[in-house]
Structures are given as C-alpha cells and as structure tokens.
Amino acid sequence: MRVGFLGPAGTYSQEAVFAGPGTENYEPVPLPSVHDAVMAVHEGRVERALVPIENSLEGAVNATLDTLAFETEEVQIAGELVLPIHHCLIARDPVELDRIAAVTSHPQASGQCATFLRTRLPGATIVDAASTADAVRIVAEREGGEPWAALGSRAAAELYGCAVLASGVEDPPGSQTRFVWIAREAPDPGQGGTWKTALMFWEPSDDRAGWLVRCLAEFADRDVNLTRIESRPRRLGLGTYMFFVDCDGRADDPAVAQAISALRSHAEGVRVLGSFPAAP
C-alpha cells in the first residue's frame, strides 16, 4: 500500500506512519507538503496519507483543515494516532549555542520550542522550513558562514549525520501531535472499540446572536460528547467562519445522526469528514 506523508525522510510524519501495527506492507511516499499528501489521495497517487491535524502545544494544523475544507470532498478521515514529540536542537557539527546565527524548522516546531528559543538563543534568526527533516537537511548541507541549527527529531539528526546540541527543547516537555489517516474509502464499520466522527459546518449569511450555541446544543441535548472544536476563516471576508468538530460515536449512531440532522437546520452547510476508530 502506498502511504503518503510530509517528507523528506526523517520527519515526525514518517515516524508516525510506522508507529502502529500492520505496517510491513506500506510503501512510504514522501511528499513536499501536507496539502500534497492529502491531494495525493484525492488524485489516486497513494492509497492513504497520514497528516498532522493538531498539536498539544500549538493547536490546529491549519494546512490540514484548509485542504480538507477547500480542496477536496473526495477523501475522508479514516483513522487517527497520537505521537509523542521530542524536539532536538541539531547542528552540522558540535557548536556553542551562543554562536548559532539562525534556527530553521517547520513553523509548528518553532512554535512548540518558543520558550527555549527565546531564552537560550535570543539572538538567533528563525527561518521557516517545509518540515523538520527538511530543516535538518538544510543544516547538514550548509557549508561556510555562521553556524545554523535546526529543530527536529533525533532520528533526523542520525539520518543526516548531524550533532544533537540539546534534546527535549519543546516547552513544556511532553508535546503530542495527533495525526489522521486520509483515505477515499471509509474504515471497516465492523471494527469494535471507541469511534469518533469529524465534521465541519459553516454559518449562514444571516446568522443571529446565539447561532453557534444552538448548533452545539444539538449535540449536548442528545448527550453526544464533543472532543474538539476549531474555527477557520471561510475566505469570504472578516467575520465569516467555518467550524470543525469531533464528537464521540459514529455518524450512523442514532444520537449522532440525529444531532447532525438537527445541525443542518441551523447551518448553511454541513460535511461529515469521516467516522473512524479513536486512538487508544
């Protein structure tokens, strides 16, 4: 099975792909962005993709939400897993921290290490990279000039032959990233255990005071627990939003189905993004 992920080799996404059971038949396909990973499923270039959707420190991964919202309706969320994230400060060679001129990484990783960067590397310029592994690759290939460092995994440091200057630099320690599986087909409904349903909805142009409360009350009134809610701009101007919600249960469970049906009476649009087994 071809499995897309945010590349290059050495990213946390690649680590997450192989974190669960049954991975022996996976053919990993590194892709340049989260958007590309999702769209590779849409276009049939891979059967599945694993992409980050939220981090315990930095919150939602907007690229994932926006791609699902604006770019495709042909894929769905088919599973999830949670990966502990332990960032390292990495350089091509051992170097004193006060000599580092710049630190490069994915913006999510830089945000997760903001306190460390502010207190230990206050003079370093922060440079965005496409992924944590790409940041380590940049540092590994950089020759001459002032020393640069990257934020990434110990595995990436080993892969690119770099030195780990400090480990556990995320603030606070214990960061976790939730990843979701993207597929064209729904997971086997016969799987037992706890399930979740992800959906998105957006407000009508004539929304009135209390609109969002009424939407969410449809779940509370049926004792359906919401496990996540996020808002994103609809790109129609200031003050227009779409909302992403996860709830316990499957979309065809009676209480969940009734809540979604009632939600449609309030919202301009509702899309079920998928029902899937919850991570342990």
What annotation goes with each model-predicted range?
Residues M1-P280:
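Domain-level signature for soluble enzymes in the chorismate/prephenate branch of the shikimate pathway
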